[in-house]
A protein has these predicted regions:
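Conserved glycine-rich
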Residues: 176-177
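Conserved micro-motifs of the catalytic ATP-binding
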Residues: 6, 10, 40-45, 84-87
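Short beta-strand/loop element within the Bergerat-fold HATPase_c
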Residues: 110-122
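Short alpha-helical segment of the dimerization/phosphotransfer core of two-component systems
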Residues: 20-25
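Conserved catalytic submotifs in the C-terminal HATPase_c
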Residues: 46-50, 68, 73-83
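Short helix-loop "hinge" at the ATP-lid/N-box region of the Bergerat-fold HATPase_c
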Residues: 103-104
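Short helix N-cap motif at coil->helix boundaries in the Bergerat
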Residues: 52, 134-145
Length: 198
């Protein structure tokens, strides 16, 4: 661009490509570093008691620009005003980020995503539900595998490394908790995970 080989009317297009690829490589590097923590078997969880609703709100707000551009709304349905869990706050924030990122990525315009919390005994359940394209039944067991994308058409235009859900599952399992997925093609997907009450 500096030497004038790219015409001014094309510069915006190429800058967007550069930005997209920079973000993709940043995401890949972050994901690989996170997976490396799990591979060393030395993953130390920094567990504290914190308000999961505050973390959900902050994570949802970080997607405000993307949601506005796609006309997607994120609805938060909370069991109570405050709800404390005992977990690694930074890692749970990463779980929520990855799940919301996927929900937005695979949702169409003018759609909504719901994040809901429920309490059952000593457990807190967090659900992230979208009205997106859904996951084929044949792929449901494979989505947790590293670098897995359900098919070329699903991943072709979608920014992603295929590591997000693998990281999500490993973080939840490191907390000795569970994560499940319910999905119907053409209807949407719901991820539900549990945490210990704090």
């Amino acid at each position: 661009m500096a030497d004038g080989t790219i015409p001014p009317e094309m510069q915006d297009k190429y800058l967007k490509i550069i930005l997209f690829e920079t973000e993709r490589l940043t995401d890949l590097t972050r994901d690989l570093l996170t997976l490396n923590e799990f591979d060393t078997k030395d993953l130390l969880l920094d567990k504290t008691s914190f308000d999961i609703h505050e973390v959900i709100r902050n994570t949802a707000e970080s997607f405000e620009g993307t949601c506005t551009a796609k006309k997607i709304t994120i609805e938060l349905l909370f069991a109570s005003r405050k709800l404390h869990v005992y977990a690694d706050k930074r890692k749970i924030q990463q779980v929520l980020y990855n799940l919301l990122d996927n929900a937005i990525k695979f949702s169409g315009t003018d759609s909504s995503i719901t994040v809901e919390t429920t309490e059952r005994g000593e457990k807190v359940f967090i659900s992230v539900k979208d009205n997106g394209i859904g996951i084929p039944r044949s792929s449901l067991n494979k989505i947790w595998e590293r670098f897995y994308k359900t098919d070329a058409s699903r991943g072709k235009d979608k920014k992603g490394t295929g590591l997000g859900l693998s990281i999500v599952k490993e973080i939840i399992q490191a907390h000795n908790e569970n994560i499940n997925v319910i999905s119907t093609e053409g209807v949407g997907t719901e991820f539900i995970f549990s945490l210990q009450r704090g």
